[in-house]
Structures are given as C-alpha cells and as structure tokens.
Curated annotation (Swiss-Prot):
One Pfam assignment: DUF2715
Name the UniProt record assigns to this protein: Uncharacterized protein TP_0617
Highest rank taxon of the organism: Bacteria
Organism: Treponema pallidum (strain Nichols)
Length: 92
C-alpha cells in the first residue's frame, strides 16, 4: 500500500506512513511534520499537575487547597491555565 494526495492533503494508507510523513502541501501545516516517535504539534497536548496542601493547626483552620495547572503547547504558543480550590477538610 502506498500513500496518495487527495485535495491537496497527504492521505496515508498505513499508520507507519502517517508516522513517517515528512512533507506537507499546505504552507501553514509545515510545523506539523511527524517523526517516528512524534505526534502532530497542531493539536493541544495538555499536561496537568495537581498540588495539594493541607493547612496546619498553627493557622487555626482545617482546610485544604488544591492548585492545578496545565501547559498547552499549540504551535509554539504557551499558555498556562490554572485553578485554585480552597475548601474544608472533613474528617471522620
């Protein structure tokens, strides 16, 4: 099986030919070249990391805070969305 061109897009016939793709007809898609171990850079790859911290008794409160942030790499543009949650700790 071989690959073919359809409407200006490279259409692979096998998964291996998709991974080995090294050319793009569209000038905007040049940055999405794929290596044998790479993935398409045109799609966002979120990386999530959560950090949880328990406030001690020396502050006089029994609560927890969770901070989560992700790095979104989309064609070399970086943005870091983050969330902060603070809530009580329920102990049984």
């Amino acid at each position: 099986m071989c690959s073919f061109e359809h409407g200006g897009w490279y259409v692979p016939k096998t998964v291996l030919s998709l991974l080995r793709r090294r050319k793009c007809q569209d000038a905007r898609a040049e940055s999405e070249e794929l290596g044998i171990t790479g993935i398409c850079q045109n799609y966002a790859v979120p990386v999530q990391l959560g950090v949880q911290h328990y406030f001690g008794a020396h502050w006089g409160i029994d609560a927890t805070a969770t901070v989560s942030f992700g790095v979104d790499t989309k064609l070399a543009k970086f943005r870091i969305p983050y969330t902060l949650r603070v809530g009580p700790v329920f102990r049984t």
